[in-house]
Amino acid sequence: MPNNNIRTRFAPSPTGYMHVGNLRTALYTYLMAKHDDGTFILRIEDTDQGRYVEGAVDVIYNTLRETGLLWDEGPDIGGPVGPYVQSERMGMFKQYAEQLVAEGKAYYCFCTEERLEALHAEQRAHGEMTHYDGCCRDLPKEEVEKRLAAGEPYVIRQKIPREGVTGFDDMVYGHIEVNNSEMDDQILIKTDGMPTYNFANVVDDHLMGITHVIRGSEYLSSTPKYNLLYQAFGWNIPNYIHCPPVMKDAQNKLSKRNGDASYQDLVAKGYLTEAILNYICLLGWSPKGEYAEQEIFSLADLVRIWTPDGISKSPAIFDPLKLRAINAEYIRRLSPEEFLAKAEPWIDSAVHTPINKKLLCANLQPRCEVLGEIPEQLDFFDAMPEYDVSLYANKKQKTTPGSAKEALEALLPVLSDEALDFNDRDAVFDACKAKAEELGKKNGWLLYPLGIALSGKQRTPGGGTDLACMMGRETTLERVKAAIEKLNG
């Protein structure tokens, strides 16, 4: 493949949910390509069948589509260097490993599991790091051919140099060197003929012309082995960008196994996709220059301004409160129509009686931070909850249960007037305000009891006249009359 444009790849394994760290890798990989009009490739790495989860490939597709991280080449749309599913590429890996064997850069290893287990047990007993001892590294060619002909099981191992150092340059962590003597002769082809993850990665990245590899910093220690493979084949080494881990706190990495939220979990809780993506981008990356103080970025903004020099070396702590604040800001920026469309499923899950959703949303939007918290605010619409008349006492509004009864009785004829249009919130408010003026009272003296009578709660999405207009005349009158009876009781 020509390397005159940036080509990046997101290469997830279909093992379940898309956790936050994976989605961040996908986002950075996408931005690295798109910032310079490059090519973003999706490759599915499904060779580890033991970890394969049915339906997980669809999760990958759906998440990337929902977040707008659309790929230019991939399993479903094809491209010039397919197939883009690793299990469909199995035939090619062994020939590359055998090429290295022929050139003396790899070798057949016939050591059994039992021998390796005994070797590692002995090394541990002596306080050593477990490693392969090179038993088969220099077997005579005739012996190797004889054992292969006899059908003896084998793996193919990379012949790591015993002396010198291997260095590489990372765009985040700088230049890193490792003594070759500290590296193991890693397995390239397993006994079942399948490639190891590292080997398949290098071969696929080369054949697909990948110019920039973006991955977690946990792969830093493997990178010298990757480089030795590139050098063994005489291939161009890609640019490396290793990202710091996303942490739950100072000690623990964010992990689905520990019950931490995946992308799907956050959406299910009512976080907006755009807000999630915005926040995830800021986990370990900071904008520069004129954007240094800005926090809200659309995907188009990020494509324009994102560069890898903003990535930090330090672990990023996932802060739920920060995500919540960013989500709230995205909710504020929605048009009333957009908010209604996003909030409606949550409203419908909680309210099954006819209400004025447009007015409800006008009251919800300024207060809402997470859509999933809407239903708990609406539990009084379908049925009036039990409440104590002491709720009517409010020092600020100068109300008591006794004054509340007086206020509701004064409101009853106002709200019963057939000429009053409950679809006109301002008209209902003005009628109530006029009654308060007639009585020589402040608005709150009249309207605070109305809110309690309609909801049985002190905190509601809207004041008394808002609730009346949301519910309509019939429900409003029923509840006001019931409240007067309760106060008479």
Named regions from a protein language model:
Residues 34-46, 199-212, 233-247, 461-466, ...:
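Glycine-rich phosphate/pyrophosphate-binding loops
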Residues 336-439:
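Small-residue-rich helix-loop
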Residues 102, 107-242, 248-254, 262:
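Active-site cores that bind ATP or allylic diphosphates and position pyrophosphate for catalysis
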Residues 83-87, 110, 189-190, 208-219, ...:
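Conserved phosphate-binding loops in nucleotide/dinucleotide-binding enzymes
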Residues 426-488:
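Charged substrate- and nucleic-acid-binding regions of tRNA-handling and nucleotidyl-transfer enzymes
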Residues 29, 60, 100, 104, ...:
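Residue-level signal for inorganic ion chemistry
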Residues 18-20, 266-274, 313-319, 352-360, ...:
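Structural motif
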Residues 2-125, 222-235, 275:
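N-terminal Rossmann-like or analogous alpha/beta NTP/dinucleotide-binding catalytic cores
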